[in-house]
Design a protein with these regions (language model features):
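Conserved beta-strand hairpin/beta-sheet module of binuclear metal-dependent hydrolase folds
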Residues: 1-47, 117-131, 137
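Core dinuclear metal-dependent hydrolase active-site scaffold
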Residues: 2-5, 15-16, 94-123, 249-252
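Active-site neighborhood of phospho(di)ester-bond hydrolases with catalytic His/Asp-centered motifs
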Residues: 28, 48-57, 73-79, 106-109, ...
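Rhodanese-like catalytic fold shared by cysteine-dependent sulfurtransferases
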Residues: 141-143, 197-239, 244-245, 264, ...
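Active-site metal-binding motif and surrounding structural segment of the metallo-beta-lactamase
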Residues: 32-75
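Active-site metal-binding loops of divalent metal-dependent hydrolases
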Residues: 30-31, 56, 79, 110-111, ...
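Divalent-metal (often Zn2+) His-rich catalytic cores of metallo-beta-lactamase-fold enzymes
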Residues: 126-127, 137, 151-244
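Divalent metal-coordination and catalytic microenvironments
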Residues: 17, 29, 55, 67, ...
Length: 453
């Protein structure tokens, strides 16, 4: 029995692993909305007997405590020291799940307590669940516990990877993250691999010298969202128990406005163009889709009450679940009737002026004063950008808005308009004006061959 559950927004994988004959199963690295695992187990005629944490996660809220409350046993690596009932396994310890034998391998490096899980059963391929140690095309980052531990963890990462690479090349590799995750660099899109394939093709596994590996892995560290440190604390303590299926309250526009006046933040989930044309004053724009939780984790303070504005109630409901996955629990409700109802109630509205790539180029050629802020990643920026643009990735805008001069209009640009709309809304919150966002983004610039490299 093997079923993979994948959160596209956080690029996070969890697994249901078990024995078809005896109907026993475990969950590996569960996310917070745990009902999906119970439902999958029921459908398979199985009973959940354990939740296994490969490590204390930094990028999402674990569902292990939720499962513990239902009587499921929680297993972790040595030294995890969770603040709720759990069992810390020893290196080499085994767990029988029906006719499937699970062997725990202590593999420090990404974190000190990290374990991999080897699943073996007669007539089945051996499978290694590698958590954040080994990815398809990449390896885990060793820096999330702070500078003082980074070098030692990087050295341990090398040793743990060497141990895993000495295993049978036919063993399947099932990592905890896919492309887009910030838990490692260079992660591929494929959901799984094999030891042999990674041994041959993974660039980070071609180092025979530990010091050379350490230099390489530390030279390619992804950005670190500010919510990562908070997630570590939440997962160590055990996340507060919540009901992800709770129906969001429908807030009358006037009630939502009153909450906003008292400090609540309105998250406008509509597309960038709709947001630009008009939105509740003070709202920020995180367009509905798989990345709502990801971007909110970057830019939303954790204890702030939130109000959602969406085109459809179902979008607000799904967004609220995504927010729970990154520990943003204080969603007060969704605005009933959406933006039309807000306007109909004569409540304050703001706009974000838009400018096309062609008009921006013309303004630059005329020498009009402006500051272009490219909110893509540094790697994207290095691949080509607008003349004289400065690079501040969208997620860093709240911390770095003060770096921007106020002597000329600010113009935000990204690849297609999603991130730059978020950035523009954050800058508007800071009172920065005049302000404009580039429609079509760098895609339009490339089409017009207007790029500086």
């Amino acid at each position: 029995m093997l079923q993979r559950f994948y959160d596209e927004g956080l690029a996070q994988a969890s697994f249901l692993v078990g024995c078809d004959r005896t109907g026993q199963a475990v969950v590996v690295d569960p996310r917070r909305d745990v009902a999906i695992y119970a439902a999958a187990a029921r459908q398979a005629g199985a009973t959940l007997v354990a939740a296994i944490e490969t490590h204390v996660h930094a990028d999402f809220v674990s569902g292990a405590r939720e499962l513990a409350e239902t009587g499921v046993r929680v297993l972790t690596g040595p030294g995890a020291d969770l603040e709720y009932t759990h069992h810390q396994v020893r290196d080499g310890e085994t767990l029988a799940v029906g006719e499937v034998t699970l062997t725990f391998l202590h593999t420090p490096g990404h974190t000190p307590e990290h374990v991999c899980l080897l699943a073996e059963a007669a007539g089945q391929p051996a499978r290694l669940f590698t958590g954040d140690l080994l990815f398809v095309g990449g390896v885990g980052r060793p820096d999330l516990l702070g500078e003082a531990q980074t070098r030692q963890l990087a050295q341990q990462l090398f040793d743990s990877l060497a141990r895993v690479m000495a295993m049978d090349g036919a063993i399947e590799v099932h990592p905890g993250h896919g492309a887009g995750s910030l838990c490692g660099a260079g992660i591929g899109k494929e959901p799984s691999s094999t030891i042999g394939r990674e041994r041959a093709q993974n660039a980070m596994l071609q180092y025979d010298d530990r010091d050379a590996f350490v230099r390489a892995v530390l030279a390619d560290i992804p950005a670190t969202p500010p919510y990562f440190a908070r997630m570590k604390r939440v997962n160590k303590a055990g996340a507060p128990l919540v009901d992800p299926s709770r129906k969001l309250p429908a807030l009358r526009p006037a009630a939502a406005a009153a909450l906003a006046a008292d400090g609540a933040l309105i998250l406008d989930l509509r597309p960038a163009q709709a947001f630009a044309a008009g939105h509740p004053y003070g709202a920020i724009n995180i367009g509905y889709g798989a990345k709502v939780g990801y971007w909110a984790g970057w830019v939303v303070p954790p204890d702030l009450p939130l109000i959602l504005l969406a085109d459809e109630p179902a979008q607000a409901q799904e967004a609220a679940v995504q927010l729970l996955r990154v520990g943003l629990d204080r969603v007060e409700g969704a605005i009933a009737g959406g933006f039309d109802a807000w306007v109909g109630a004569s409540l304050p509205v703001a706009e974000i002026p838009q400018i096309t790539a062609h008009d921006l180029r013309a303004a630059i050629d005329r020498g009009e004063p402006m500051h272009v802020v490219d909110v893509r990643t540094p790697a994207e920026f290095r691949g080509g950008h607008v003349d004289h643009a400065v690079n501040i990735p969208a997620g860093e805008i709240p911390a770095r808005a003060g770096e921007l001069p106020r002597d000329a209009p600010i113009v935000t640009i990204c690849e297609g308009g999603y991130r730059s709309s978020l950035a523009a809304s954050l800058l508007a919150q800071e009172g920065i004006a005049p302000l404009a966002n580039v429609t079509g983004g760098m895609a339009a610039y490339r089409a017009a061959k207007e790029v500086t490299t």
